[in-house]
Amino acid sequence: MKNNYSEANIKILKGLDAVKKRPGMYIGSTDSRGFHHLLWEILDNCVDEVLSGFANTIAVVLHAENQITVSDNGRGIPFETHSDSKISTIDTVFTYLHAGGKFDNDSYKIAGGLHGVGASVVNALSDQLQVTVKRQGKVYRSVYENGGKIKQKAHCIGNAKIDEHGTSVTFRPDPKVFKKIHFDSELIRARLKELAFLFKKLQLTFVDETGSGEKEVFFTEAGISQYLDELNADSKQIAQKIFVSGTEDDIELEAVFQFIDGEDEKLLSFANSIRTSEGGSHEASFRQSVGDVINNYCRKYNFLKERDKNFEASEIREGLNGIIKVNLPEKIIAFEGQTKSKLFSKEVKAVVQKLTQKHFFQFLERNSVDAKLIVEKLFYNRKLRQELKQQRQIKKNLSNPKAERILFGKLAPAQSKKVAERELFVVEGDSAGGTAKMGRDRFLQAILPLRGKVLNVEKINNKKEAINNEELLTLIFCIGTGIGNNFTIRDRKYDKIIIMTDADNDGAHIQILLLTFFYRYMKPLIEKGHIYLALPPLYKFEGRDKKARYLWTEQELEQYRAKHSHFNVQRYKGLGEMNADQLWETTMNPMTRKLIQVKLDNFIQAEKQINVFMGDKTELRKSWIEANINFSSEN
């Protein structure tokens, strides 16, 4: 490092250069979530027009070559020359950071876009972007390239009908910023469907030109009540839905929640239509208010005696499913960072508290049968938690005798003392487990073979059954975080937990059993990106040169067959068919292996998949595995 630190070392990033230099500061990451975030930003700008009452249709079209168009029938971006920038307002919005109508309290009373930087950030991180505006009987267009450089400044390209208005943005993420760009049509559908739930009678359309090309329409009459019905579709409801709505101090709240027969809490929250996946002030106030109402009601009607403790938050949250939607004035809305995953606005707390307590207490007073069923469930939760005291010991380290006894002879630990370096391979069977133990990097990689049958946790009644299953209990001890409400992610003993199974139907079934367990009892491991699937090769290919090549797909095999006239092909039926060196080289070596990181991008879709995977209908599970997982067959 040079010691001559002077004014020459200080760089001033002009225009959109700051975004290009540090894209993660603005969109969170440059992986698939990053380029999808660009789409969400443009979509959020359309939604802002809906929130303000100026638009009722939004259209998304996915084109070839990773181009995508988002249109609305809102007011349209003004095209007149801006007084400060001295260029068209369209070009100002798309080439200046912190330029937009959201800094003017009159233009957008409520908005969810990225505080005036969304459009320009998308432009900065796209290699092509085109804006078309219909407004005041004119059609204007601007074209940009190479990260926001003006190719064609805003200019009139024709006339529009006087009642035609709106904005259309077509862009392509910059391949120099994002690797392996591929828009996920299912993810886009899920977001459009979510918006249809959030805004009654808003029409959203989607056309996937890379697929069927058919127009899909998303529209609801009942809004978030319909959303909760879908969330609870496969659950047994304890009581009817509870509705909360009202406006205080220009803050609008709409919420619907329901208690179901289950142990998980499923609470989805939104602020100005933005999904706040990490919660925030609105979610915290809602939870606190629900708990206060329940305890006050139980005291008033003597369900809780004087000697009884109040219900704890963790007891109340088990089986509580709900949707919370708040709309806040732009002047007070505050998110954590630019990606808006957590709401910080303090003003929302009192409003949510007042309205939730009022409506929920009225519901309990007016619906005594439902109230009694809810209270009975809470007492059941309390009784179950008392029976699960042994589970609290799971969070303790592996020095306790029970853990040592359970793990003895099973776990081959990693030697590194640093959690960030350690990997745990959860391996199907003793045979593959033994090979993995011989082939691994002993310093960084731990091996845990699964010897018995993994429990399908979707078919059990409570956590007690999960921790009585030896294979799951071993896994719980090994990971070290605890489960359910006693889960603490900072106690994890590994940074990567890698499921390594055979590439066949049985292997896929074991993967799904384990993923179901992680989803139900250790969900933050998935949310924080710590769960992976190993991808062992399907084939070993040797040509005339006798050099071994490992192939992962049927397509790769066909390509090699076309290039070689003489060859031998071995189809790996299981991990145990590879020796230790081969398993290391193909599946475990961080420099050469292929891993799939398990992600949770859509809550309801995940719920539905889990129910397909692990519910009572085995024919659904079998057909899904056969349709969606390609194991390739021997020829």
UniProtKB/Swiss-Prot annotation:
- Record has Hydrolase as a keyword: no
Q: Which Gene3D superfamilies match?
A: 3.30.230.10, 3.40.50.670, Histidine kinase-like ATPase, C-terminal domain
One MF annotation (Gene Ontology) recorded for this entry: metal ion binding
Report the PROSITE patterns cross-referenced here: TOPOISOMERASE_II (PS00177), TOPRIM (PS50880)
Domain annotation Toprim: ranges = 422-537
Q: Which cofactor does it need?
A: Mg(2+); Mn(2+); Ca(2+)
Q: What is its EC number?
A: 5.6.2.2
Q: Which reaction does it catalyse?
A: ATP-dependent breakage, passage and rejoining of double-stranded DNA
Comment on bound cofactor: Binds two Mg(2+) per subunit. The magnesium ions form salt bridges with both the protein and the DNA. Can also accept other divalent metal cations, such as Mn(2+) or Ca(2+).
| Uppermost EC category | isomerase
Q: Which domain of life is it from?
A: Bacteria
Which residues are marked as site: Interaction with DNA?
Answer: K453, N456, H509, R621
- CDD domains recorded for this chain? HATPase_GyrB-like, TopoII_Trans_DNA_gyrase
Metal-binding among keywords = yes
Instruction: List positions binding Mg(2+) 1.
Output: E428, D502
Which HAMAP family does its entry note? ParE_type2
The function of this protein is: Topoisomerase IV is essential for chromosome segregation. It relaxes supercoiled DNA. Performs the decatenation events required during the replication of a circular DNA molecule.
Protein name as annotated: DNA topoisomerase 4 subunit B
Organism of provenance = Mycoplasma pneumoniae (strain ATCC 29342 / M129 / Subtype 1)
